[in-house]
């Protein structure tokens, strides 16, 4: 039974429910076909749906439990109807090009022995290949679409249902990019779903509801524009250290942060009026863990939040938010981006997020009011900017809400510009006074207006090189994949200075601020740079210890490349031993923070002692992470300041391009008399 229809989707090729298990195998080719069985018996009449963003097609299995579709290549969401007696998500988005020849496995496995009963229902997961139990695609909140768009997440009602937790829920709306593993044909195209608020759990197989194991809650990064929880696995941390690991999706882009109080009824909660919907999704995940994690063997009184990049900024938001008091007890902040570039758009005053750009308190060029003005003109409701501003002021709350909530995600996203690929140029976290204090980041942490818990924080030595790869003023891409450096000298200098600026504000200054209020601040620098030389591409020079490369090491997963297309350029058999050692080292420190409240000497007390941060700049106050083949893991002296960096950049004469030099200076320090005298 074969049906043919056209999709801009990817190819999948076998999905089955077998031996008390749901399992799916995706093979090459353009067919979707498979067999459905339960406890080894073929099941007829089971609905299987394949869809993209334009249409969907459903078929049912035949008497042999088999089904088949014939499809072109592209992007699919494959969903299997739950077997009788179960509810819940059993689908997964699949990215695959029709011209790929490799085989990709996507498994949906249900093991009845994994049953965990909570107030939300009884969840059934499956076993990972290392014996860890996992529960994926657990609904953390009702779908934030329709009237729930731009509202605080609504908790899921209690139930006694048997719920499939066998596949991660769909990613939140974002644009396709190399950083979210989309194929090149989907770069810049919308992927994901508004119905995306799902979480995933990993636990040791023998963990019971009385074990009170430490919990590690991961928040992914992606510039508040892209990313998803299913990129990361907690199975290695759970296996090695006996902890519970949780990760989750949160709304991003304008669906995650959209500060326009006029859109909401006055009776709406302060949380809904905050504009911080992605941040509220993160708070909601903590609330979910607090209520339910004991059923999985976790201790709600021993929760560690850790995140990278935008996830690190989110971790800072969790530390600062009045809503998270008592919901977590340790934190790790990996490569937060805290405004070293003058036009940064993270953690903004309300005026910046909301106002028009020409008001007395000017808003950002893509503030919510500016976006609304653009939308009214685009949709033919206003002839020009002045008319759009006048119309905006006369719209009732109901008219405004109906107009914006009725807009498709595609229409909404088309109003925004992007930078460095799929990152949206827009304000995100808002200082609303309810979800986030009405203070800037430095003031919040300098004055102690946050939850003081033991903290690991740090940055990577070559943070910004990952982003230089996407800058057209430094690199040229061949075939949309291979970056060629235009000028090696300028590239290395830019990578050095941008990365130093990142480290100063997000490591040195943040550590100094927090250590004024607490003693248990532990600071690191990630130095691993043993990528291979690929003849025309010396990846150690191109990337070095770049942004995001430390993530796999903190998760004891040395083969994790957050950008899958770079896997070949990062990992080799030659650097495997060093990577494995470093992953064991870093993850042991992270896990020991979760378990004891201090990284100390790691879980087995066999690593260098990690001492707390001090304002004594001559002290060894920084843990440097590297392999034994290089300089090893050791405490080092670390000291850098914006004033010192500025003096070095002003004295720099090594740039061949004046425009690159001028752009770097103004992006880090802003326009001043020094640079004005040099640059036109």
What residue spans do the PLM features occupy?
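Non-catalytic accessory segments of hydrolases
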Residues: 111-276, 300, 565-583, 597-601, ...
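A short, solvent-exposed beta-strand micro-motif common in secreted/extracellular proteins
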Residues: 74-85
């Amino acid at each position: 039974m074969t049906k043919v229809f056209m999709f801009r989707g990817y190819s999948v090729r076998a999905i089955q429910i077998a031996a008390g298990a749901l399992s799916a195998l995706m093979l090459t080719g353009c067919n979707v076909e498979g067999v459905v069985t339960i406890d080894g018996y073929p099941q007829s009449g089971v609905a299987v749906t394949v869809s993209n963003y334009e249409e969907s097609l459903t078929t049912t299995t035949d008497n042999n439990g088999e089904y088949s579709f014939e499809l072109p290549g592209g992007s699919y969401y494959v969903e299997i109807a739950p077997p009788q007696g179960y509810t819940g998500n059993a689908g997964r988005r699949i990215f695959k090009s029709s011209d790929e020849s490799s085989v990709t496995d996507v498994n949906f496995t249900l093991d009845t022995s994994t049953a965990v009963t909570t107030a939300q229902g009884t969840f059934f997961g499956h076993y990972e290949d290392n014996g860890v139990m996992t529960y994926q695609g657990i609904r953390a909140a009702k779908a934030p679409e329709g009237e729930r768009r731009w509202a605080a997440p609504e908790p899921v009602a209690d139930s006694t249902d048997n719920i499939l937790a066998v596949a991660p829920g769909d990613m939140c709306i974002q644009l396709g990019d190399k950083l979210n593993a989309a194929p090149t044909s989907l770069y810049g195209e919308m992927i994901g779903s508004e119905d995306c608020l799902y979480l995933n759990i990993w636990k040791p197989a023998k963990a019971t509801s009385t074990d009170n194991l430490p919990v590690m809650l991961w928040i992914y990064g992606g510039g508040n524009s892209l990313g998803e929880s299913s990129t990361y696995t907690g199975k290695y941390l759970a296996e090695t250290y006996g902890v519970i690991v949780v990760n989750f999706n949160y709304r991003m882009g304008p669906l995650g942060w959209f500060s326009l109080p006029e859109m909401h009824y006055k009776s709406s909660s302060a949380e809904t009026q905050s504009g911080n919907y992605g941040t509220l999704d993160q708070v909601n995940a903590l609330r979910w863990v607090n209520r339910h994690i004991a059923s999985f063997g976790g201790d709600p009184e021993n929760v560690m939040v850790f995140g990278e990049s935008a996830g690190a900024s989110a971790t800072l938001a969790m530390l600062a938010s009045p809503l998270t008091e008592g919901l977590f007890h340790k934190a790790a902040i990996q490569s937060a981006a805290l405004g070293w570039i003058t036009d940064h758009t993270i953690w903004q005053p309300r005026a910046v997020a909301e106002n028009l750009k020409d008001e007395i308190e000017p808003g950002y060029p893509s503030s919510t009011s500016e976006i609304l003005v653009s939308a009214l003109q685009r949709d033919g409701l206003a002839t020009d900017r002045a008319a759009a501003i006048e119309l905006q002021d006369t719209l009732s709350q109901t008219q405004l809400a109906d107009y914006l909530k009725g807009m498709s995600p595609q229409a909404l996203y088309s109003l925004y510009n992007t930078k460095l690929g799929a990152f949206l140029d827009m304000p995100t976290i808002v200082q609303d006074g309810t979800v986030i204090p009405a203070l800037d980041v430095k003031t919040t942490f300098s004055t102690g207006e946050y939850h003081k818990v033991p903290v690991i924080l740090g940055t990577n030595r070559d943070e910004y090189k990952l982003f230089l790869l996407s800058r057209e003023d430094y690199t040229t891409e061949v075939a949309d994949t291979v970056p060629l450096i235009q000028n090696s000298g300028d590239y290395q200098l830019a990578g050095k200075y941008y990365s130093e600026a990142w480290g100063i504000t997000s490591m040195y200054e943040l550590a100094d601020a927090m250590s004024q209020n607490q003693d248990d601040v532990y600071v690191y620098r990630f130095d691993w740079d043993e990528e291979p030389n690929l003849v025309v591409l010396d990846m150690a020079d191109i990337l070095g210890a770049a942004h995001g490369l430390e993530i796999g090491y903190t998760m004891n997963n040395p083969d994790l490349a957050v950008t899958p297309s770079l896997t070949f350029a990062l990992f080799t058999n030659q650097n495997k031993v060093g990577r494995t050692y470093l992953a064991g080292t870093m993850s042991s420190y992270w896990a020991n923070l979760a378990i004891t409240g201090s990284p100390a000497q790691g879980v087995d007390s066999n690593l260098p002692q990690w001492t707390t941060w001090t304002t004594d700049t001559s002290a060894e106050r920084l843990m440097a992470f590297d392999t034994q083949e290089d300089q090893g893991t050791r405490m080092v002296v670390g000291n850098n300041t914006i004033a010192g960096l500025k003096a070095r950049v002003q004295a720099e004469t090594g740039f061949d391009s004046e425009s690159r030099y001028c752009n770097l200076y103004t992006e880090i320090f802003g326009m001043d008399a020094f640079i004005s005298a040099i640059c036109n």
